[in-house]
């Protein structure tokens, strides 16, 4: 997938969030703010493991409220069923093999996400969004592969 296709894909994603957040009375508002976008990406989670998708065993009130007040997507696909590869797919919009991530990257891995790959965070930065990632990165452990080199303003993980 080339950069233009990825830009269109991610612009469409942002637009989908935006359209769901605008009421008819807001359409003409001159000071309309872009929507907040939160992507939650969890390894090995079942469909009904959180409240918005039916979990009853434990409360998830903040996730429930986010789902109620925003957009909730119900169909999910990953490029591969391991952490590093599926993260690479989500962040680049490309198949993991296309971007050189063939499986899970352990602490001894010498490679990671290539600097030439455009990420979702970099596209969001072009639209003046602040970006952050919290939790497991798993796309390379050397400085050139870390989140701050790929469009994220803040990282803890």
Where are these regions (language model features)?
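Formylglycine-dependent sulfatase
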Residues: 2-4, 8-157
């Amino acid at each position: 997938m080339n950069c233009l296709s990825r830009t269109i894909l991610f612009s469409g994603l942002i637009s989908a969030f935006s359209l769901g957040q605008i009421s008819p009375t807001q359409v003409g508002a001159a000071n309309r703010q872009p929507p907040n976008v939160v992507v939650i990406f969890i390894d090995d989670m079942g469909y009904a493991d959180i409240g918005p998708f039916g979990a009853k065993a434990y409360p998830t009130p903040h996730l429930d409220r986010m789902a109620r007040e925003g957009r909730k997507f119900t169909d999910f696909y990953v490029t591969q069923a391991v952490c590093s590869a599926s993260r690479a797919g989500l962040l680049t919009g490309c198949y993991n093999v296309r971007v050189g991530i063939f499986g899970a990257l352990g602490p001894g891995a010498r490679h990671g996400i290539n600097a030439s790959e455009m990420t979702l965070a970099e596209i969001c930065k072009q639209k003046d969004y602040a970006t952050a990632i919290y939790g497991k990165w798993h796309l390379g452990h050397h400085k050139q592969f870390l989140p701050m080199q790929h469009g994220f303003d803040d990282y803890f993980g």
